[in-house]
């Protein structure tokens, strides 16, 4: 639950699914159309662990591959206008970020920048990604991206659905940022003030 002087935001539900049925037939983002297999479920994502070469004596090398399931994360969120004035063209944004938690401290990480003993980055062939939502249920032909609520009268609430496709092995470390700044790879002042939603609780 997040609020400021004008708007409050409440996460009503977060659902995790193997398919895109929650979106309906006509609302699937174009970049997700190839992510569904013949059985109707999301296809697996092939991760390739890369050892980078120096470009002179050695080239980039795939040291191992791994197949992981992709999952739909579907968040239902309610925005409420707490002010005395109508709010027009309200930008809304949800971002997922990944955090490690150890010894009381949290650190944001990018899964493509993970490294190990024999690799220094990870790439994959699926559509899985965190950061900004790929699907949103309410849009307005306004601004860049269309993720606007056209009007919210004083005291009025509106429910919005947002969705991402993610790698299943990242779910335990996934947090939802709804403060509107879109931060996903570093802590922002507004994020630290409003907090995050642990979606896997």
Annotated model-derived regions:
Residues 1-201:
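Conserved functional micro-motifs across diverse proteins
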